[in-house]
């Protein structure tokens, strides 16, 4: 059995670790709430653009934008959104399993894939997998800006325009609630048709196009894709903070259990030491 002094040192060390994990849990909870507010604030913008795009597309019968047109799929582009940091449980591992499953499904159909990566964890993981990587962005922090995403979004858009890829998807962790984050595959291009009752009622909307529907759709579609990628990244950030909060709470609880176990061992060691001292005193008295 370890000595009492050694056990006290271990208890002090675990208590220090417990303080750190408790602080990280509280910080993650605060960041998660702020990220949820950004999620709620950005969603109406992308929803409004999506409806306007659908209105214009349905009203322009003589023009079909390539971003809205299905074509034979020979190559698929995936934007993968991961975290820059760890200590968030199995969040990234579950995401990467989903990505690998999507890549395998396409490969089995004879379809090639190319990746655009967001986050250090995705970059370090997929660079060792031998997958074609077109673009990557890291270090977005807790408050990503839209301009930080322009490169990776425009890169995939150009690949789609040039016919280098025939579909574009984004894969990220969708925030369900504090205890649940779900890896999600969302199609970006070609844009899925919006199911909305008011789209059928042409009398409820009417636009005069300046200069023309093509130019307007070009601009709106790019803005919409940027907003969708931004929304996915913010969603993933909320998932990261929730997963980190849960992981740090588990670590804090485990530290508390370990302290209790060490305290019990310390008490036994202390009791044994006192018993030995008493035995020595009794033995000495008997010898006299």
From Swiss-Prot:
The keyword Transferase is annotated on this UniProt entry: no
Subcellular locations according to the entry: Cell inner membrane
The keyword Calcium is annotated on this UniProt entry: no
GO biological process, one term: proton motive force-driven plasma membrane ATP synthesis
One GO MF term attached to the UniProt entry: ATP binding
Keywords (A to Z) from UniProt: ATP synthesis, Cell inner membrane, Cell membrane, CF(1), Hydrogen ion transport, Ion transport, Membrane, Transport
Gene3D superfamilies cross-referenced by the UniProt entry: 3.40.1380.10, ATP synthase, gamma subunit, helix hairpin domain
Membrane topology: Peripheral membrane protein
GO cellular component terms given for this protein: plasma membrane; proton-transporting ATP synthase complex
Main localisation: membrane
Transmembrane residue ranges: none
Record PROSITE patterns: ATPASE_GAMMA
Segments forming a coiled coil: none
Family per record: Belongs to the ATPase gamma chain family.
Function: Produces ATP from ADP in the presence of a proton gradient across the membrane. The gamma chain is believed to be important in regulating ATPase activity and the flow of protons through the CF(0) complex.
Subunit annotation: F-type ATPases have 2 components, CF(1) - the catalytic core - and CF(0) - the membrane proton channel. CF(1) has five subunits: alpha(3), beta(3), gamma(1), delta(1), epsilon(1). CF(0) has three main subunits: a, b and c.
The protein's name in its UniProt record: ATP synthase gamma chain
Gene source species: Glaesserella parasuis serovar 5 (strain SH0165) (Haemophilus parasuis)
